[in-house]
Regions:
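Metallocofactor- and cofactor-centric catalytic cores in central/energy metabolism, strongly enriched
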Residues: 1-191
Length: 191
């Protein structure tokens, strides 16, 4: 289902190429990509609901496509097997783009929840998703891979701004390492 969701997101991104997106489109793209990150969601119902949200959004943007008699295929969901069955160099570069924007979506999602967004970051999701579906060679894909890194830095700055605006500037503090009697709660995390 994660591949199906990714293919639907690619179709949605391509639908926005020359059509105006709604106020909700960026959120759906970011949430959808974030949903496909390892260890974020294993619930099939949640994935199916996200796929439905993507399809509904695409129908809002392009209402005539769903009833078109002479389908062009330009906005259809992308078949992810096209990547997995591709030449190993193309598969590797497209995978770097895909996994890079998935990771970037995690940062963008958390920043968005805190009220911070960036048009450059959001627009790059559409560009990268669309490029994944194009028939491109290694020479054309490599600059996009590098651009993922550049935009990811901008996205990390966005998340830092969101966090420091919401929670203040983090600073190291001393904590007690002594063992106390009684029940306790352990809080862990990573970044």
């Amino acid at each position: 289902l994660q591949d199906e969701l990714t293919g639907a997101l690619i179709g949605l991104a391509k639908s926005c190429g020359s059509n105006p997106k709604t106020d909700n489109t960026d959120r759906i793209i970011i949430e959808g990509l974030f949903t496909t990150i390892t260890n974020v969601n294993f619930n099939n119902e949640t994935l199916k609901n996200m796929i439905d949200r993507v399809h509904k959004e695409k129908n809002i943007i392009l209402p005539d496509c769903s009833v078109c008699q002479s389908r062009c295929g330009n906005t259809d969901d992308y078949d992810m097997n096209n990547i997995w069955d591709a030449d190993e160099d193309i598969r590797s570069l497209k995978s770097l783009i895909l996994f890079g924007i998935r990771g970037m979506a995690a940062y963008a999602y958390h920043a968005m929840v805190l009220g911070c967004t960036d048009e450059t970051v959001n627009n790059f999701f559409y560009k990268a998703l669309s490029i994944i579906s194009y028939d491109m060679d290694s020479e054309q894909l490599l600059p996009v891979v590098l651009e993922v890194g550049e935009v990811n830095l901008k996205c990390m700055e966005l998340l830092d701004k969101a966090n420091t605006t919401s929670y203040g500037t983090p600073a190291p503090v001393k904590v007690s390492l002594s063992v106390e009697p009684g029940p306790f709660i352990v809080v862990t995390g990573h970044d």
